[in-house]
Regions:
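Extracytoplasmic
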Residues: 1-26, 223-228
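Helix-loop-helix hairpin linking two adjacent transmembrane segments in secondary transporters
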Residues: 121-174
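Structural signature of the two symmetry-related core transmembrane helices
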Residues: 58-72, 276-293
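Cytoplasmic helix-loop-helix junction between adjacent transmembrane helices
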Residues: 86-126
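Extracytoplasmic gate region of multi-pass secondary transporters
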Residues: 11-12, 204-260, 314-327, 350, ...
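Conserved MFS/SLC helix-loop-helix module at the cytosolic interface between two early adjacent transmembrane helices
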Residues: 42-81
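Helix-breaking motifs and short loop linkers at transmembrane-helix boundaries and internal kinks
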Residues: 23, 55, 76-82, 93, ...
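Residue-level signature of mid-helix packing/kink "hotspots" within the transmembrane helices
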Residues: 9, 37-45, 129-130, 250-254, ...
Length: 403
């Protein structure tokens, strides 16, 4: 998770430098974000089934290798068209990250522990987002912008080796005892057989998850791809100066990721229902996002950083509980497919926000409207999810009869 976010954020950190290098305007930069999101959405439509069929270990390994090569490819590009191709490839490769991660959580943890486990792995995204603006300025000073893409991309192959060395499903892991395996399977109600995407789409639970992802994921993409620019444009920080504020934002986001998972897991251990535990955590996080509407109006850079950091923490807490819903409501064998559909919806939302933010900045030069959108998205998402699924319940996927 950490490496995945490092790859996608290098472009955001180098945004102003690359705009000076190639003469890109805000709309052209928005097209680069749009290309990534388009490929991410398309990948999500197929990668979940790919990982469900190939298995978590091998499926994730393939995606790591693919996106690392795509990240390195940025360093060879000399035009907007070349960068569009590289961003598209990176987005397609990285679309496998969350479906594979959620499937791994479903394989290794019982339902009561999944939100906290999801929060911990989701915290890795914030580590990557925080490290990138600290590392990239030093690489840039020594080897230029191409060296930034080469160096960060090459790290992926270290992650690939570690993944293949360390990960096994619990049934195949030498250190997983019979008692631990029974604990993992303590709340499994599993059926076997083939399934279709059409069968998954018949359920309101699917659409609740998809709607939530469509509405909140674009806000995270906005933070990821435009916060360095916001700090440079609104508060006059240099490439070297943005590192510490970005670090603070994503450290706070880490606390939110783990804290959001802890809150719902705590409520479950206190005997609350899955429905009450997850939705309580979602509501608390949605409320905590609202103050970000003032981020563009404060004159102090650190006041703005704290407002964005609170919103980022709340987003991650919300996202942690949202990402747990597929494993709460669906059999483990379809979790990656459901997660893929949600990820595709989130990426489509990201495509829209890329063009909206780019045009707003080109026309107004102000972040006021994007922050207003960010502050309202989570309460809207929770309201839509509540309308679709007033009570979270497990889904049984029908299996076609066999001859």
């Amino acid at each position: 998770m950490t490496k995945n976010y490092m790859d996608r954020q290098v472009l955001a950190v180098l945004k102003i430098n690359l705009q000076h290098q190639f003469g890109w305007n805000e709309i052209q930069y928005g097209h680069l974000v749009f290309a990534f999101q388009t490929a991410y959405a398309l990948g999500m439509l197929v990668v979940g089934r790919f990982i469900d069929r190939l298995g978590t270990r091998v499926g994730y390994a393939v995606t790591i290798g693919f996106w690392s090569l795509a990240s390195i490819a940025h360093g060879f590009m000399n035009s907007l068209g070349g960068f569009l191709v590289a961003r598209f490839a990176l987005g397609f490769g990285e679309s496998g990250v969350f479906p594979a991660s959620l499937k791994a959580v479903a394989e290794w943890f019982p339902k009561k522990e999944r939100a906290l486990a999801t929060g911990i792995f989701n915290a890795g995204t914030n580590v990557g987002a925080a490290l990138t603006p600290l590392l990239v300025p030093f690489i840039f000073a020594r080897w230029g912008w191409r060296g930034c893409f080469f160096a960060v991309g090459a790290l992926g192959f270290i992650g690939l080796a570690l993944w293949l060395w360390l990960y096994r499903p619990p049934e195949q892991h030498a250190q997983c005892s019979t008692e631990e395996l029974q604990h993992i399977r303590s709340d499994v109600t599993e059926s076997s057989g083939k399934f279709s995407v059409g069968e998954i789409l018949r359920h309101r639970q699917t659409w609740a998850f998809v709607s939530g992802k469509f509405l909140i994921d674009p806000i995270w993409w906005f933070y990821l791809f435009w916060m360095p620019d916001f700090l440079e444009r609104r508060h006059g920080l240099s490439l070297r100066q943005i590192g510490l504020p970005i670090l603070v934002i994503y450290v706070l986001a880490d606390f939110g990721s783990v804290g959001g998972g802890w809150l719902s897991s705590f409520l479950l251990h206190r005997g609350k229902t899955v429905n009450l535990a997850r939705k309580t955590a979602l509501l608390v996080c949605a409320i905590c996002v609202v103050p970000i509407i003032f981020a563009s109006r404060v004159s102090s850079v650190w006041a703005a950083v704290l407002l964005v950091g609170l919103a980022a923490a709340a987003h991650q807490g919300f996202s942690t509980n949202l990402l747990t819903l597929p494993s709460d409501m669906f059999p483990a064998r379809v979790v990656a497919s459901v997660a893929g559909l949600g990820g595709a919806a989130g990426a489509v939302g990201g495509m829209l926000i890329a063009e909206v933010v780019a045009h707003i900045l080109q026309w107004t030069g102000s972040y006021t409207i994007p922050f207003l959108i960010a502050g309202s998205a989570y309460l809207l998402a929770l309201a839509v999810m509540q309308l679709l699924v007033p009570k979270l319940e497990a889904v049984r996927i029908a299996i076609p009869p066999t001859a």
